[in-house]
């Protein structure tokens, strides 16, 4: 059985979180580290936006500040995500890995098998949403909203028809980086405050529909889960789903310094976060 590296970096600031994902991608591409799975949280709670999103057009920065949230642009695509009461994961693995299909959606399904097993470990009957009709496929290509959890995408994980985990993927330097959110609890009012809408009516309609489309884990359970229980379930889930053994790892001082350098040069800058 193959051994992958496991890093639980705890709650970190948004720039550090994105910088560590980028550093892991770089180190893996250089052959310095094995494939890696990382768990993390956010301090402060943060709005992350997709690589291609337009801040001015889509994001209500006044409310981001009012809610005292961090703000960062991800290196991956997708839409806006409020990282608050959630477990965030990232998977870093070479495209050349024998178990990784060349197609993005298929690789996504393989990696997400670990998440699927994690939900099952928690007693939740999760399954993959696969768009069946042309209409559903078109909805993926032309998302109606800036809010990530608004609709399941290819192979997104769903429980009772509602999305439970959102993920995004990028491929750089021959390496796949997939990261995503497993949401324990969600403050819908806060989430919907963070985006711009053509009118208040549109916001109300979207927020109403959202309830039918996305659901945090603890809403599906009689007894709320602690973060430790969730971490254990998904760590076991990744081992089972990917048939790997995860070996805990702590970054060296030199590695930490490199991550902080990337954070400073990219993810802490307005040039990156507010780029046109």
Swiss-Prot record:
- Please state the pathway this protein functions in, per its UniProt record: Protein modification; protein lipoylation via endogenous pathway; protein N(6)-(lipoyl)lysine from octanoyl-[acyl-carrier-protein]
Mark the transmembrane ranges. none
Q: Where is the active site?
A: 148 (acyl-thioester intermediate)
| Gene3D superfamilies listed in its UniProt record | Bira Bifunctional Protein, Domain 2 (3.30.930.10)
Record's SUPFAM superfamilies?
Class II aaRS and biotin synthetases
Output one GO MF annotation: lipoyl(octanoyl) transferase activity
Site residues (Lowers pKa of active site Cys), renumbered to this chain = 163
**What does the UniProt keyword field contain?**
Acyltransferase, Transferase
GO annotation (BP), single:
protein modification process
Q: Which reaction does it catalyse?
A: octanoyl-[ACP] + L-lysyl-[protein] = N(6)-octanoyl-L-lysyl-[protein] + holo-[ACP] + H(+)
Stated EC number for the protein is 2.3.1.181
Q: List the Pfam families.
A: LplA-B_cat (PF21948)
Outline the extent of the BPL/LPL catalytic domain.
31-246
**Subunit comment:** Monomer.
This chain's function reads: Catalyzes the transfer of endogenously produced octanoic acid from octanoyl-acyl-carrier-protein onto the lipoyl domain of GcvH, an intermediate carrier during protein lipoylation.
Family, similarity comment: Belongs to the octanoyltransferase LipM family.
What other comment is given for this protein?
A: In the reaction, the free carboxyl group of octanoic acid is attached via an amide linkage to the epsilon-amino group of a specific lysine residue of lipoyl domains of lipoate-dependent enzymes. The reaction proceeds via an octanoyl-thioester enzyme intermediate.
Q: What protein does this entry describe? A: Octanoyltransferase LipM
């Amino acid at each position: 059985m193959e051994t992958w590296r496991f890093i639980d970096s705890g709650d970190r600031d948004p720039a550090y979180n994105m910088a560590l994902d980028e550093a892991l991608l770089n180190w893996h591409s250089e052959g310095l580290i094995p494939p890696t799975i990382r768990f993390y949280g956010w301090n402060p709670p943060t709005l992350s936006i997709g690589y291609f999103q337009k801040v001015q057009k889509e994001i209500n920065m006044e409310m981001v500040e009012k809610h005292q949230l961090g703000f960062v642009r991800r290196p991956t695509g997708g839409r806006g995500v409020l990282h608050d009461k959630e477990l965030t994961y990232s998977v870093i693995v070479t495209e050349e890995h024998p178990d990784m299909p060349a197609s993005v959606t298929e690789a996504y399904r393989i990696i997400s098998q670990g998440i699927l097993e994690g939900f099952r470990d928690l007693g939740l009957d999760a399954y993959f949403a696969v768009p069946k009709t042309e209409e559903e496929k078109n909805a993926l290509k032309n998302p109606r909203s800036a809010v990530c959890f608004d609709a399941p995408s290819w192979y997104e994980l769903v429980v009772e028809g509602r999305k439970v985990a959102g993920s995004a993927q990028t491929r750089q330097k021959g390496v796949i980086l997939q990261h995503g959110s497993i949401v324990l609890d969600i403050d819908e009012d806060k989430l919907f405050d963070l985006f711009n809408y053509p009118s208040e009516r549109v916001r109300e309609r979207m927020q109403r529909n959202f309830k039918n489309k996305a659901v945090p884990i603890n809403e599906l359970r009689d007894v709320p889960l602690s973060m430790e229980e969730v971490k254990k379930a998904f760590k076991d889930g990744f081992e089972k789903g990917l048939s790997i053994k995860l070996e805990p790892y702590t970054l060296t001082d030199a590695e930490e310094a490199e991550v902080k350098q990337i954070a400073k040069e990219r993810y802490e800058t307005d040039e990156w976060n507010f780029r046109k």
